[in-house]
Each structure stands twice: as C-alpha cells, then as structure tokens.
Amino acid sequence: MKILGFMTGTSLDAVDMAVLETDGVEISAFGPAGERKLREATRDLLLKTTDIARAWPRGEPEPVIFEEARRAVADEHFQAAESFLDEHGLSWSDFDLLGVHGQTVLHERPTAQRVGRTVQLLDADRLARLCGRPVAFDFRTADVAVGGEGAPLAPIYHAARARASGLAAPVAALNVGGVANITLIGANGDLLAFDTGPGNGMIDLMLQARGLGRFDEDGRLALAGRVDEAVLAALLDSPYFDAPAPKSLDRYDFSLTPVDHLSAEDAAATLVAFTAEAVFKAFAQSGEAPSALIVCGGGRHNPAIMQTLAARAPVPVKSAEAYGWRGDSIEAEAFAYLAARTAKGLPISFPGTTGVPAPMTGGRIVGLISA
C-alpha cells in the first residue's frame, strides 16, 4: 500500500507529512517527506481549544469549540498536503490510504481509579471528501478504552524501521517532541516503550510565558545558562519517574513553577537537563542496556539537548540521520505505517508499549480502500 502519513504534535508547529509503501509489516519504499507550518489562526484556535479541553469535566458534553477545531485541523491538513503533492509531482490518486493522527488537545493517563482520556481532533469525513481518499484516524481511543495509556504508538514502527536499516538489537529510539518518548527494542525483539518526561514542551512554554519567543532557537539560551541542581532535583522528584512502564504524559503534566525564579538562560539549561535526566531514568527501567540511542524529533535540532544527552548518556547518542533515518518525519511515517496495520487488522498497541492486556489493533477508517 502507498500511504501518506500526517502528524501534528503538541508543539503546534507544523503538519508533518511522509510517504511510505508498506504492507503493515515491512517497509518496501520511502517516498518524499516534508512539512508545512501551521497558520497562526489555526494555532491560536488549537491553543484555545487545548485550554478548554484541560478544564473539561468528565461526564460533561464535549466543548462546542471541538467541532470548529476538527474542521480547522482537516482543512489545515488538506492545504498542507495540496502544496506537498504539488511540490513532489504527486496526486491524490497515487495513494491507497491516508494515515492521520489528528491534533491532541487532551491526554490523561489512567489511574487505579479511572481509565484515561485522550482526544485527537480531526474531521476525518471532511478530509476524506476533500482528498477523495480513505482516511485512517483515531488511533488511540480503543487503547485507552481498555485501560491502556494510549501512547506511545510509534514503537512498532521503530522496530520495523530498525529492521529496514539493518540495526542489531538491543537498540533504543528516542523521540523528542513536546513530550519525549523512548522505544527499547530488546535483543529478542520485545518492545518496551513509554514517555520518559518532557521534551521541548516545557522549554517552549517557559519562553512563551516570558514573551521570549516560541522556542529556544539553536539552544542558545540553554547553552548560555547554568543548571540549577536543586531545581533539577525538585523537578525529578516526581512519582511519575518511579511508576512502572509503560506510562504516558501530557506536555502540561509538569509545572514550570520551580524555574520561575531563574533567569531565562538558567531556566532553559535546567529544563534541558530535566529532559536528559528523565531519559536516563528510563534506562534504569529497561533492564537491558541498548547499544545506541537514536534521537528523532525536533529536539535533536537543539544543540543543548543533544550535547546534554551525549554528556550524560551511558550509551552512544546519535541523531536519526546518522542511521539513515529521517528524523523530522519519523512520526508521520509511523502513522502511515499504523494506517496500514489498521487496514489489515494488525496490532498497533502492545502490553509493553501502552499497557493493554494483549496486543490489539486500533484506529478507524472512513472511505473505501481499493482492493
């Protein structure tokens, strides 16, 4: 199947797109990949929607703004893809299926008292009509409904990508987005995956709250700052890090209050160290040291994050490109791959990745897939 995958993360930066040819097990070919920045109006709407979603009481009707946001997300994806297809000389008829994550506005992990909640907004019917292609979407809901974490979902793709690269296990893939998550591929092929802690999200939120821009470009502030070890220790003193894996996070799960008194430079440096130390706590839970840590996602473009990871890591740390991976496109590729698995009824969630009782498929498809 030839599939166009889409991903928009909680950083609300861009629509990522990637073309993949796959049967849902092995990868037969990689097509072009790219991104389109979110329009400010869409970003503002989604920020507002996220704030409302976080205050949404359980058991109450969903907020009215969700429907407006669903349409906006569908339109944003369509317009992004139109320019992407034009740039690469492709047409909608080239694809068997679209795999679309949608925009996360709420993610609450399960507790002993209740199941989790997860909301990815997308008007899939609208997008399918606009594109004239079937759309696979809503990949997390079924997982959460049976008590799973709903995240991360990319691990089964990381395993396929590692096979395609000829990488010998054990190996680990780290995605640094708004939240950081890790996939540990054991020597026997078993998967253990979970959110390690914050990625770029806390740094971005800190800078935005101080009116200093949307992100720390090239890690300049963090590289100019000093880590406050007392604040770092306070940040790491969270029950989340002692909780057994698998487990998941929302980018808003940690408070910025501990860094409020620090300069922007020292706050950024301390938050970078927080991201790195949380990753190394993850290694302690794995029980099997990986031969290498492959870093994907936007965080690998931040020299402060990469330098801190490399300095503190017990294993070699390299960006995805060192292994021939497309680090900015891994998540979009993953949802193309997951779309194929959804179409074929193959599992996308596993006990070691989201905590579901048994491997299970997920996602829904609107529109008809050609035989």
From Swiss-Prot:
Keyword Transferase: yes
UniProt entry keywords in alphabetical sequence: ATP-binding, Carbohydrate metabolism, Kinase, Nucleotide-binding, Transferase
Pathway recorded for this protein: Amino-sugar metabolism; 1,6-anhydro-N-acetylmuramate degradation; Cell wall biogenesis; peptidoglycan recycling
Main EC class the enzyme belongs to: transferase
Name of a matching Pfam family: AnmK
Enzyme Commission number: 2.7.1.170
Residues given in the record as ATP binding sites: 9-16
Biological process according to GO: 1,6-anhydro-N-acetyl-beta-muramic acid catabolic process; amino sugar metabolic process; peptidoglycan turnover
GO molecular function: ATP binding; kinase activity; phosphotransferase activity, alcohol group as acceptor
Source superkingdom: Bacteria
UniProt catalytic activity: 1,6-anhydro-N-acetyl-beta-muramate + ATP + H2O = N-acetyl-D-muramate 6-phosphate + ADP + H(+)
Signal peptide (from-to): none
SUPFAM superfamilies: Actin-like ATPase domain (SSF53067)
Coiled-coil segments: none
Described function: Catalyzes the specific phosphorylation of 1,6-anhydro-N-acetylmuramic acid (anhMurNAc) with the simultaneous cleavage of the 1,6-anhydro ring, generating MurNAc-6-P. Is required for the utilization of anhMurNAc either imported from the medium or derived from its own cell wall murein, and thus plays a role in cell wall recycling.
Listed name of the protein: Anhydro-N-acetylmuramic acid kinase
Organism in which the protein naturally occurs: Caulobacter vibrioides (strain ATCC 19089 / CIP 103742 / CB 15) (Caulobacter crescentus)
